[in-house]
Amino acid sequence: MTISKFLSIAAIIFSLTILGAEAKPPAGSSDVSSHVNKGVELAQQHKYDEAIKEFSAAIEANPKSAKAYLNRGTAKRALQKYDEAMADFAKAIEIAPKDEMGYLERGQTFVMQKQYTEALADLGKAAELKPDDTIAIRLRGFAEIGLGDWDKAAADFTAVLQKDPNDAQAYERRGFVYRSQKKYNEAIADYDKSLEIKPDPDVYAKRGYTYVTYLQNYEKGIADYQQTLRINPNDYDTQQRLQYAQSALAAKNAPAGAPTPAPTPEPGLFTPLNIGIALVVLLVLIGVIFVVTRRRGGGEDEAQSSGRIR
């Protein structure tokens, strides 16, 4: 699960929590409660501008309502008005410094802006104020992943799982951490557990990537990619990875090529046949030279004989 996907879920849970908290307002705060509840309803319908107006009305009715500031901050954050959201969260912390929610929401906003170091301070404070709440610990794990602090991230997601052993997202995130630490078998085990609790195409894709890229287990990787595409057929990245894995498996299983025969050497000049022919030619030449030489010697004798006085 990506950080943005988780944060959107966390925002919904937060809004529902605030709605329940404001349902029983203290005496004399009915106007504040009414505006807050109406604002939460509008925010849940993604009507953030209208929700902000309701939360602002609640603040006008009671400038000390930390919840109104928190809710207005979350609505502004949904509109990506991060600086204004931060100001509202800071005001909520000023009003209620012992309430973890202001630190939690500001820390979450820091994570969304990839300001991980700043996020750690707020999320650590939120976890300190409410140790049993896993949201702050989980978000701190996200920040630690962003900083590449793998050991601390693994510890935080382990802490989440100790409180809730059926948290599929915590298994997925810890699996990602293990993979980043090159603990591939541990990563696979966490992905397995996450999928056992809640099948998710993103987790199938991550497990498939781990099988193919790091373990060269193409068969299992292909199966995971195919499962991802059954759930989400338009996942282009997974389509490309599936094709790569199939090509790699085909290359791995291809039969070895037949050995190329060594070339037959060309016969050399000094073969028995060539030597025999050379000897015959040599003998013939010797014979010819001998005959010619004999003939020349006889002619000279005849010339000398014919020149004598008889």
Segments predicted by a language model, with ranges:
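Register position in tetratricopeptide repeats
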Residues: Q44-Q45, A78-L79, M112-Q113, L139, ...
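Cytoplasmic C-terminal tails of single-pass
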Residues: G297-R310
